[in-house]
Amino acid sequence: MEVSIPVGAQPVVAQPERTPVAVRAAVARLDVTVLPRFEAEWTAATAQARDEYSVMPVRHFIEKWWLWAAVRRWPDLAARLRECGRRSAEAADLMDARAASAEIGEILRVAADAAA
């Protein structure tokens, strides 16, 4: 379950700043087909923030999509994440599901560390 970014590998795009505009631009460059979902979630997060008088929904939204970009800017990591998600969903037993879920966590950690 060794997860790493190969030495000398370059991301497809630079990691965006943690702002809605920068993250949206990265999402558009990485996969324009998810922009409708991004926009819908942004609208929901801002409405929730307004209703709750809290910045937390917006902060969670930005963090989620920032991490999405952190993974997808490395195509091999993104492919491995999709495969682990499939393995977890189709696991025949709890141990297989846990192993796939643990690998998902490691992929997210590696991507976040590389983006920091």
PLM regions and their residue ranges:
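Short terminal alpha-helical segments
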Residues: 2-47
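A composition-driven signal for long, intrinsically disordered, charge-rich low-complexity tracts
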Residues: 5-14, 61-64, 85, 103
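Short interaction-prone segments
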Residues: 12, 61, 70, 75-86
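Intrinsic-disorder-associated interaction segments
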Residues: 12, 16, 31, 51, ...
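Exposed alpha-helical structural elements
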Residues: 22, 34-37, 57, 76, ...
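Amphipathic alpha-helical interaction modules
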Residues: 34-73
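Amphipathic alpha-helical binding modules
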Residues: 78-116
